[in-house]
Design a protein with these regions (language model features):
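Beta-sheet entry/capping signal
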Residues: 31, 113-116, 146-149, 240-242, ...
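Non-catalytic terminal/interface segments that mediate subunit docking, oligomerization
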Residues: 76-97, 118, 136, 141, ...
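Glycine- and acidic
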Residues: 11, 28-31, 78-86, 104-113, ...
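Cofactor-binding active-site loop characterized by glycine-rich and histidine/acidic residues
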Residues: 76-93, 97-107, 114-265, 288-289, ...
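Acidic, glycine-rich active-site loops and adjacent beta-strand->loop/helix elements
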Residues: 153-157, 180-181, 242-252, 275-280, ...
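N-terminal amphipathic, basic-rich helices that act as targeting or association modules
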Residues: 2-166, 170, 509-525, 536
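Long, well-ordered, tryptophan-enriched scaffold segments
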Residues: 276-503
Length: 648
C-alpha cells in the first residue's frame, strides 16, 4: 500500500513556529503509513491524544476531515453492475418523474409537487435499488423479510417513475399523480403526494412527509429489530434499515434527537444517506458555512461512522495532479452559498471564479473545455462512488453509518432550475428547458414528445428493462411494497386478565391501577404474553408499574452490568437482554417511535406485537401529535394510554 501524501491535507492557515520540527513529525508519521500498518498508525494517534489530555493542554482533535471523499480511489470496490445501462435508467427515471409533476400542474395548477429534489437524489436511489435494498421474500425464513427503506418524501415521484418501468404502474396512473379521489373514475390508481401507507396500503411502508419523523422512526425501527432478535422472537440479524433524507431535514429536532441512542445500541443495521444538495425551500441550508462539515462533526461526535461522498470520478485526475493541496484549500474556503452558485452557473463561470482563484488551480484546469468543467460531477451523482460508499456502509460493524452525499439540487435542469434559489418550488418547464433537459440526459424523445411531456418506457424485451428487473430479482423482488398479513395470535378470555375489574364489588380503584393489573396479567398469558410490549418514558413508577421491572425486565442490549441499589426489593430495577419493557427515558418522541415500530411489526416483520405506551396526558398529543398521526397513517395496531395529568 502506497502511503498518501498527507501534507497537502494539513491546515495551511495555522502558523508554524518551527517548520523543521514539524517536518520531522510529518516524515515520521508518513514513514509509519508507508509500512502499511494502518492499525499501528491509529494506535500512535490515539496514544498521542491520551497524552495530550493527560497534559491538560486543552486540545481537542478536529472532528471535521478535508472536503474530499472518505473512501480513496485505491480502496473503491469494483462496480458490479452495467454502468451504461444504470446511467440510462437513472435518466429515464428523472424524465418520467419530471413529466409526471409538470403534466399534473399543467392540468391543475394547484396540485403542486417537486421536481428538483428527485433530480438531485435519483442516482442515490438507483444504486440502492439496483444493488442494496433487499425486498421481502415470501417464505418461512425470517432472514428473508427484507430491508426497511425510508424514502426522502419530496422524491416520491422518482419512486413512482421506477414502479412505472417495473410495470407496477401505468401511464394512466402516472397521469393521476396527486389525484387520488378522481383517479378511480378513470380506471387509475391515484398516486399520493408523499409516501402515505393509508392512501396506498400495498405500496408505501413508511410515511416520511412530515420532516423529522422519518429519521427518528428509522432509528427506533432498527433498535426494535434488535429487540425482536435479542428476545428470540424473530431473527433480524441479516436485515438493514436504510434512510434517504435531506440536509435541510436535519434541522428538525426529531432528526437529531436519537443519534446517540443509535450509537449507544451499536446499530450497525442502520444506514442513513443524507442528500446534501445544499438547498431547502427558501434558500441555502447553510449559505455561510458547509452543511456537510457541520453534519460530519455532529454525527461523528454522536458516535456514528461517517462517510463523506463529495466528488465524482471526474475529479480523481485533478486530485492526483494536485501536489500542493490547492483543491482542498480552495474547498475549505468555499461556503455552500458559493457552491450553490457554482452549481447554477456554467463551465465558463466556474473556470473563471473557481479555478481562476490562483495559478495552481488554473494549471489544474488547463486542457479542460468549459463543457468538461461543467460536467464535473459531485459525488452523489456518480454511481461508482455511490456504490463504494454504500458497500462500505453495509459492511461496517459496530456503529450506525451516515453517508453525506454532495449533490446539485435540480441536477440536469440547466438554466430552468439547477442550483436556482426557486428550484424547490419548480413545477413546470418551458419548451426550451424541456428540450435542453432531454439533450442533457440523451433521452430518446423527439422535440414534440419532449414538449408534450410524454412518458417514456423502453421495450419490454430491451436490455434496460431486462436489467432493471433482473437486479430486483437478485434482491428479492419489487420495492417498496407493504404487507398486511401475519400470523394470528389467540386473544385470552377477558376473565383471565380482568376478572378483578369485572367483579370489583364496588371496590374503588383508579383507572391507572386497573390498567397496570390487567397489563401484568396479560404479560403472564402463555399465548399473548411474549408479544406484549410495555413502553414508558421514565414514568413507570408514577403509574405503579415498578413491579413489572422484576417480572419481565427492562430491555437492554448489553444486559445489566451493575448491581442495582435496590437488588433485594420486589421492585428492583432489572435490565436484561431479553427484557420486555422498553424504557425510553425522558423522550416522548422516542417512546412513540418505539410504539410505532412495535405497532406496525405485523406489516413490517410479519409478526404481530401488542404495544402499550402509557404517558402523562399533558405530554401526549401536545408533544407527539404529529408522530401519532404518522402511526395512524401506517395503520398501527396497539394501545396509547393517556394517564396521570396535572400534579405528580
Amino acid at each position: 500500500m502506497n502511503a498518501p501524501d498527507i501534507r497537502k491535507y494539513l491546515n495551511q492557515e495555522s502558523i508554524d513556529s518551527d517548520p523543521a520540527e514539524t517536518a520531522e513529525w510529518n516524515e515520521a508519521f508518513m514513514d509509519l503509513l508507508a509500512s502499511g500498518d494502518s492499525e499501528r498508525a491509529k494506535f500512535i494517534l490515539d496514544n498521542l491524544v491520551k497524552l495530550a489530555n493527560k497534559s491538560q493542554i486543552n486540545w481537542v482533535p478536529d472532528l471535521v476531515t478535508p472536503y474530499i471523499n472518505t473512501i480513496p480511489v485505491d480502496e473503491q470496490p469494483e462496480f458490479p453492475g452495467d454502468l451504461a445501462i444504470e446511467e440510462k435508467l437513472a435518466s429515464l427515471m428523472r424524465w418520467n418523474a419530471l413529466a409526471m409533476v409538470a403534466r399534473a400542474n399543467e392540468a391543475y395548477g394547484e396540485l403542486g409537487g417537486h421536481i428538483a429534489s428527485y433530480a438531485s437524489a435519483a442516482d442515490l436511489f438507483e444504486v440502492g435499488f439496483n444493488h442494496f435494498f433487499r425486498a421481502r421474500i415470501e417464505n418461512n425464513d425470517p432472514k428473508d423479510r427484507g430491508d426497511l427503506v425510508f424514502f426522502q418524501p419530496h422524491s416520491a415521484p422518482g419512486v413512482y417513475a421506477r414502479a412505472y418501468l417495473e410495470g407496477r404502474l401505468t401511464d394512466n396512473d402516472l397521469a393521476h399523480y396527486r389525484r387520488e379521489i378522481t383517479a378511480p373514475e378513470a380506471g387509475a390508481k391515484g398516486l399520493s403526494s408523499y409516501p402515505h401507507p393509508w392512501l396506498m396500503p400495498d405500496f408505501w411502508q413508511f410515511p416520511t412527509g412530515s420532516m423529522g419523523i422519518g429519521p427518528i422512526s428509522s432509528i427506533y425501527h432498527a433498535r426494535f429489530m434488535r429487540y425482536l432478535t435479542d428476545r428470540k422472537l424473530l431473527d433480524c440479524t441479516t436485515r438493514k434499515v436504510w434512510g434517504v433524507f435531506g440536509d435541510g431535514e436535519m434541522d428538525e429536532p426529531e432528526s437529531m434527537s436519537a443519534l446517540t441512542l443509535a450509537s449507544r445500541e451499536k446499530l450497525d443495521n442502520l444506514v442513513w444517506v443524507v442528500n446534501c444538495n445544499l438547498q431547502r425551500l427558501d434558500g441555502p441550508v447553510r449559505g455561510n458555512g458547509r452543511i456537510i462539515d457541520e453534519l460530519e462533526k455532529l454525527f461523528r461526535g454522536s458516535g456514528w461512522n461517517v462517510i463523506k461522498l463529495v466528488w465524482g470520478s471526474d475529479w480523481d485526475g485533478l486530485f492526483a495532479r494536485d501536489t500542493t493541496g490547492a483543491l482542498v484549500k480552495a474547498f475549505a474556503q468555499t461556503v455552500d452559498g458559493q457552491m450553490q452558485t457554482f452549481a447554477a452557473k456554467d463551465g465558463s463561470f466556474n473556470r473563471k471564479n473557481f479555478f481562476g482563484q490562483n495559478e495552481e488551480l488554473a494549471r489544474l484546469a488547463q486542457g479542460m473545455t468549459d463543457e468538461q468543467i461543467d460536467r464535473l460531477k459531485r459525488g452523489g451523482h456518480d454511481l461508482v462512488k455511490i456504490y463504494a460508499a454504500y458497500h462500505a456502509a453495509a459492511n461496517h460493524i459496530g456503529q450506525p453509518t451516515v453517508i453525506l452525499a454532495h449533490t446539485k439540487k435540480g441536477y440536469g435542469m440547466g438554466n430552468a432550475g439547477q442550483g436556482k434559489m426557486t428550484t424547490h418550488s419548480q413545477k413546470k418547464l418551458d419548451d426550451e428547458a424541456l428540450i435542453e433537459y432531454r439533450n442533457r440526459f440523451n433521452l430518446p424523445l423527439t422535440d414534440e414528445q419532449a414538449k408534450s411531456l410524454k412518458f417514456f418506457k423502453p421495450e419490454e424485451s430491451g436490455p434496460e428493462l431486462k436489467y432493471l428487473k433482473e437486479q430486483r430479482i437478485k434482491l428479492g423482488g419489487q420495492l417498496p411494497r407493504r404487507y398486511s398479513a401475519c400470523e394470528k395470535i389467540s386473544v385470552p378470555d377477558i376473565q383471565s386478565y380482568a376478572a378483578f375489574a369485572i367483579k370489583a364489588e364496588e371496590k374503588e380503584m383508579s383507572t391507572t391501577m386497573a390498567f397496570v393489573r390487567m397489563l401484568g396479567n396479560l404479560l403472564k398469558d402463555k399465548g399473548l404474553g411474549a408479544k406484549v410490549v410495555p413502553i414508558v418514558a421514565d414514568e413507570a413508577r408514577t403509574f405503579g408499574m415498578a413491579n413489572l421491572f422484576k417480572q419481565v425486565g427492562i430491555y437492554s442490549s448489553v444486559g445489566q452490568r451493575y448491581e442495582p441499589e435496590d437488588i433485594g426489593s420486589v421492585l428492583s430495577y432489572r435490565e436484561a437482554l431479553d427484557g420486555q419493557i422498553l424504557e425510553e427515558g425522558i423522550s416522548e418522541a422516542g417512546a412513540i417511535a418505539s410504539w410505532t415500530a412495535a405497532a406496525t411489526s405485523y406489516s413490517v416483520h410479519g409478526i404481530a406485537m401488542l404495544p402499550f405506551y402509557i404517558y402523562y396526558s399533558m405530554f401526549g398529543f401536545q408533544r407527539i401529535g404529529d408522530a401519532i398521526w404518522a402511526a395512524a397513517d401506517q395503520r398501527a395496531r396497539g394501545f396509547l394510554l393517556g394517564a396521570t395529568s396535572g400534579r405528580t
